[in-house]
Amino acid sequence: MKHTPSVWPNMVQLWRKEWGLGELPFYFAEIAPYAYGGTQQEKAAYLREAQFRAQSLIPNSAMISTNDLVEPYEIYNIHPRNKTKVGQRLSYLALNLTYGLKQIHCFGPQYKSWTAKGSEAWVSFDHLEMGICRNYDLRGFEVAGEDRVFHPADKVWLHWQTNEVVISSEKVPNPVAVRYCFRDFQVGTMIGGNELPTIPFRTDNW
């Protein structure tokens, strides 16, 4: 799935054709964190990326993130216990996008762009109408330099005036790429003010 997000629209197109329901809304959940081959592996991260990209290829579709709905002890639990919030988040998509209840927020922060400022990476996001929740430490960020080796950020802070996240690592004096929760198992802690999580992302294409 690393390079084949088109698999998803082909599947949905077939289902819609078989059911004869036109562009029936297709809302789905991002696969949850799980240590398929160890915590530092990235295979599942590429699948999540393909899921996210599939939204732009499938008309009338949307995805929820689940990367904050697992506990550290669930590292080898492929079906995490917290099912209620998964259902709630899917219902938010339906209520907002299908039934037009726009007062119900259905999207968490999504990566928009980033800029290098010296040794710091300044990252901006879409869907920040309610800002970023400051009740959590911002963990899960990594930064890489020209050697393409990613290091955990040792300093992450929120520039609240612009809602940008500023990331740096002492091991990376000149950042060229940023990743967030781009591992098989990494629990997300960056939550929007609407209590919805940030979609895992990477800025590189290596």
Report residues per predicted region:
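Composition- and surface-driven signal marking solvent-exposed, interaction-prone regions
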Residues: 1-6, 41, 137, 191-195
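Catalytic-core region of carbohydrate-active enzymes that cleave or remodel glycosidic bonds
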Residues: 2-62, 85, 93
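Short, contiguous acidic/charged loop-to-helix segments that flank catalytic cores in large enzymes
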Residues: 2-3, 77, 81, 153-157
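Hydrophobic, well-ordered secondary-structure elements that form the walls
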Residues: 15, 90, 178
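Short, flexible loop/turn elements at secondary-structure junctions
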Residues: 30-33, 67, 127, 171
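Flexible loop/turn segments at secondary-structure boundaries
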Residues: 33-38, 70-74, 130-132, 186-188
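Catalytic cores of secreted or luminal carbohydrate-active enzymes
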Residues: 47-140
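C-terminal beta-sandwich/jelly-roll accessory domains of carbohydrate-active enzymes
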Residues: 122, 128-206
